[in-house]
């Protein structure tokens, strides 16, 4: 009986499991079987259930995770988490060395660490027990992510007696390549969107409201700095002490006595970069002596004693075997490169983006060419150039097909001469894409209805258009291979939930050409109801901020098509309740945003209009007075300036969460 245990025996069991965790997750040298470990953990949980008052903050059960309240409080950092300046060339590197040596008057010892591509965190210990963990945030304040950080098995929840009573460590939270592949495999099996890269996956995991789910993903941590009342005068020695106290240090810190040694090490690390278990995007160079660091000091933006040397995105060379055509939900034909498989960043690449016909013409890409492929943090790599010296004889310029590869109807060319579209409303490819988009995360967000399920239901003749989703029955789902009682109940529950749709989400889900989520929100805020949107005139639409003539014409055209109106009416008759827009949201009130780069889910004007509609302002240049920089693809110099000024950086997904918190 567990009620026979004393508190001393409970604490001894905690310490025993703590040692097992250290041997397994840090030393990778377990001395007990998984079964024996599980039995110990079950015993611990049982004792804590009998005596909840005994549970200590460093109990191994804290790693299993509880549900988080629903928000992450913002807390001020004890020391600012400044950024590190970047260098991409040897010239920039030498400038850094010259500045350091000119200030100090001699060549210092440098410590090099792998720049792991992850999420920076600060973790605080009091009385040698982990009490708080914060994200980097804007460098001055971060979000309290303690509950999810505790799920990292390699991180000690309690420190040994030789460690300082009060200690703060800084580190990078990340996923190994292998774990990242496992996570995306699970995402694919669940028909959920894959993560673009390990860094995005780590960031998303730290923000999960279920720490139990976070624990299942196996986050890793690598410490790169420590603050205590009595630090040694060597940064390298401090890291070695952290390692001795049980902290994981995966950055492979090494000391070098000369600039020549540092440069040689950078070249050597570049050679083994792809063989490392985790993604790195460079190497951090630090002046090792902490007194020298104080002399060098810092700017408002970054430390003067550290520099991040960034490697260029990895490129591969392979053969372009074919150019395939994908048909999207609006009928747009998109060319995709079929490649002879090539390994990039540790994974096999056989498909790459070609964007559109104009891009293919500009780069003169032909089938049979030897092409350069680059993987720069996206799921789908891109073809960046052609090796003309290796072009085979007889190749011909590629031209967009005149007929849809799916329904074989003639395609039409848009007035912008870039988009080529299949206008056949019955085309199966476009129909499936429309349905998939309709139920997707950025639209009605109907869980458990992924692309494979949609395609199977379509192939079985159970759905033909979007409104059919709301008529799916248990008998229909039983015909889908692999579906069981629990899965069927989950799908039907999600469909029922989606019947109460906020106006802006419903409009976005319709997939009106040129109307993204930003435009949908602008329409909802202006007209407040679905009826008003559907009956709006061209003149009424044109006056809305963010809705230009082209978008207005597309909206009017969409609601003048009888098929579209009939389908919406059918949805309403099936119980769909489109909720009127509420003006209560002012999520951007008093905030100033600047946007750089191209956005994917909405146009620049839609994003700006949405920010203004939520009470925010949109600036044109980066300065200390702005609150956020929103970064899309191919950002300009604004990104570098914002990083120097420590202005919070948002990607498009971050912006959408602010604009549409529900």
Curated annotation (Swiss-Prot):
One of its GO terms (molecular function) is metal ion binding. Pfam families: BRCT, DNA_ligase_aden, DNA_ligase_OB, DNA_ligase_ZBD, HHH_2. GO terms for biological process: DNA repair; DNA replication. GO terms for cellular component: cytosol. Its EC number is 6.5.1.2. Its cofactor is Mg(2+); Mn(2+). Belongs to the NAD-dependent DNA ligase family. LigA subfamily. NCBIfam families: dnlj, PRK07956.1. DNA ligase that catalyzes the formation of phosphodiester linkages between 5'-phosphoryl and 3'-hydroxyl groups in double-stranded DNA using NAD as a coenzyme and as the energy source for the reaction. It is essential for DNA replication and repair of damaged DNA. This is DNA ligase. The lineage of its organism: Bacteria, Pseudomonadati, Chlamydiota, Chlamydiia, Chlamydiales. The gene is ligA.
């Amino acid at each position: 009986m567990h009620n026979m245990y004393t508190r001393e025996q409970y604490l001894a069991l905690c310490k025993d499991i703590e040692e097992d965790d250290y041997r397994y997750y840090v030393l990778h040298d377990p001395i007990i079987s998984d079964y024996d470990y599980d039995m110990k953990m079950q015993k611990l949980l049982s004792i804590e259930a009998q005596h909840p008052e005994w549970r200590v903050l460093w109990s191994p059960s804290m790693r299993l995770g509880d549900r988080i309240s629903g928000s992450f409080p913002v807390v001020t950092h004890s020391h600012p988490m400044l950024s590190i300046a970047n260098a991409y060339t040897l010239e920039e590197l030498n400038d850094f060395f010259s500045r350091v040596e000119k200030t100090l008057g001699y060549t210092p010892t440098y410590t090099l660490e792998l720049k792991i591509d992850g999420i920076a965190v600060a973790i605080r210990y009091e009385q040698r027990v982990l009490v708080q963990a914060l994200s980097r945030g804007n460098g001055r304040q971060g979000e309290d992510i303690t509950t999810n950080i505790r799920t990292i098995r390699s991180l000690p929840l309690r420190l040994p007696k030789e460690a300082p009573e009060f200690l703060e460590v800084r580190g990078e939270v990340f996923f190994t390549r292998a774990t990242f592949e496992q996570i995306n495999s699970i995402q694919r099996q669940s028909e959920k969107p894959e993560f673009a890269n390990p860094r995005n996956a780590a960031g998303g995991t730290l923000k999960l409201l279920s720490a139990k789910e976070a624990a299942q993903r196996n986050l890793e941590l690598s410490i790169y700095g420590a603050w205590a009342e009595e630090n040694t005068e060597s940064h390298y020695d401090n890291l070695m002490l952290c390692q001795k106290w049980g902290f994981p240090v995966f950055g492979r810190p090494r000391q070098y006595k000369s600039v020549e040694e540092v440069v040689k090490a950078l070249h050597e690390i570049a050679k083994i970069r792809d063989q490392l278990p985790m993604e790195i995007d460079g190497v951090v160079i630090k002046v090792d002596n902490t007194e020298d660091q104080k002399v060098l000091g810092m700017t408002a933006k970054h430390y003067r004693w550290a520099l991040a040397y960034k490697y260029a995105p990895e490129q591969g060379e392979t053969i372009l075997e074919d150019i395939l055509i994908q048909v999207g939900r609006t009928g747009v034909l998109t060319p995709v490169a079929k490649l002879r498989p090539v390994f990039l960043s540790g994974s096999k690449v056989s498909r790459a983006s070609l964007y559109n016909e104009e891009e293919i013409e500009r780069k003169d890409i032909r089938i049979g060419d030897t092409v350069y492929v680059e993987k720069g943090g996206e799921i789908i790599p891109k073809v960046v150039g052609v090796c003309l010296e290796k072009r085979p004889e007889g190749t011909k310029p590629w031209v967009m097909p005149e007929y849809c590869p799916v329904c074989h109807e003639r395609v039409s060319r848009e007035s912008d001469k870039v988009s080529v579209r299949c206008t056949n409303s019955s085309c199966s490819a476009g129909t499936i894409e429309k349905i998939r988009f309709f139920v997707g995360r950025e639209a009605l967000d109907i869980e458990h209805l992924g692309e494979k399920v949609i395609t199977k239901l379509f192939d079985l003749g159970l759905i033909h258009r979007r409104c059919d989703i709301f008529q799916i029955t248990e008998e229909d789902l039983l015909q889908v291979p692999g579906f069981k009682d629990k899965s069927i109940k989950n799908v039907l529950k999600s469909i029922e939930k989606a019947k109460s749709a906020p106006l802006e989400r419903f409009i976005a889900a319709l997939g009106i050409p040129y109307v993204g989520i930003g435009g949908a929100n602008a329409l909802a805020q202006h007209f407040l109801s679905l009826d008003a949107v559907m009956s709006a005139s061209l003149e009424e639409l044109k006056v809305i901020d963010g809705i230009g003539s082209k978008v207005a014409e597309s909206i009017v055209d969409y609601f003048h098509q009888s098929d579209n109106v009939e389908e919406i009416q059918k949805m309403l008759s099936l119980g769909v309740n489109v909720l009127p827009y509420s003006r209560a949201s002012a999520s951007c009130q008093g905030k100033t945003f600047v946007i750089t780069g191209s956005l994917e889910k909405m146009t620049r004007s839609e994003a700006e209009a949405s920010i203004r509609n939520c009470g925010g302002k949109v600036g044109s240049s980066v300065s200390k007075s702005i609150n956020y920089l929103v970064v899309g693809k191919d950002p300009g110099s604004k990104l570098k300036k914002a990083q120097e000024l420590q202005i919070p950086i948002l990607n498009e997904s971050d912006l959408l969460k602010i604009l549409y918190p529900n």
